[in-house]
Structure formats: structure tokens, C-alpha cells
């Protein structure tokens, strides 16, 4: 049942019921099982038991609910969870390689350009985004863990990674243009 959530190297599904739309298939129970499975896969990939995972989400209505369930699943497998709140997909990758953060893994809750009722997850380590085979492994494991009534109470430390990431971007643009105010005098149309 969870295997159908695979969309290449992402997980995508319907998280909000709409009139005449597809049935919900990315539920909190599914997100909980996916969180547990991601923790197991990450521990095996890194060959370590104590893992730190950062979660971020876009502004979709279902994001907070799905992250709570995913975070609870991560906690259930012993992962320390850090909540970056509203974030961008590139920022979640950068959270794995930025000094002072260097998370073992990160997850972005997003469905990119898809309609509002959809949502999903993208997974990262310092080596980059998870690939199709990794997602298949997560969903195969999650299927064995899937149960109704999953726990969605989770513990996470809230962090401000977006402020750090934004400062990195500003610095890179200033260095690249050799200007303190590289956009000064330009008009956006």
C-alpha cells in the first residue's frame, strides 16, 4: 500500500481530501512508519546508532501534521529530531553540510509544484538526496511497520537554520559580484 507513494526519488501522496479528488494516502500513520523506516535506513547507511535529523516543510496545510507524525517515527527509532519549521528544499540539504549543524540526515516535507492537497518527503544526507532505490527501501520497511493509530507526539528542538542559510546565500552573492549591495539600482518587473 505504501509503495504507491514512491515518485522517483521522492515520496508523494494525497494528504488532504478534496471534492471529487483521490483518496488520502499520505496519512499521519504512513508518515510515522516512513519516519521510523528513514531512521533505520539512515542508521544502516551511516553505520551509527545515534543520529540527528533535521526536518523542514513548505507552507502546505498538511505539512505540520505530517512532520509531527514523521518526527514521532524518527523519535521511536531513537533519532534526535530538529525542527527547522518553514524551509526550502536546498536548505534542508545544506543542513547536513553546514558547520555548526552537520545533521546526519534531513527531510523536507513538500510536493513542489503539485496541487495543495498533495504533499510528500525528500530525504538528504551530506552525500546528497536519496535516490530511487533508497526510497523503495524506506517504503518497503515502512510497509512492515505500518499500523493504524500511530503516535504523533514527538520531541524536537526548534532551530533557526533558514536565518543561517539566508546569510550564506547573501554572502555568496556578495562575494560573487564583489558588491556589498549587488541588486542596488535594479528593477524587478
Predicted regions span which residues?
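Gly/Ser/Thr-enriched, mixed-charge loops and adjacent short helices
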Residues: 119-189
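Predominant activation on well-ordered alpha-helical scaffold segments within soluble catalytic domains
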Residues: 35-39, 71, 75, 93, ...
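Glycine-rich phosphate/diphosphate-binding loops that line cofactor/substrate pockets in enzymes
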Residues: 34-53, 174-184
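Glycine-centered structural positions embedded in regular secondary structure
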Residues: 13, 31, 35-39, 73, ...
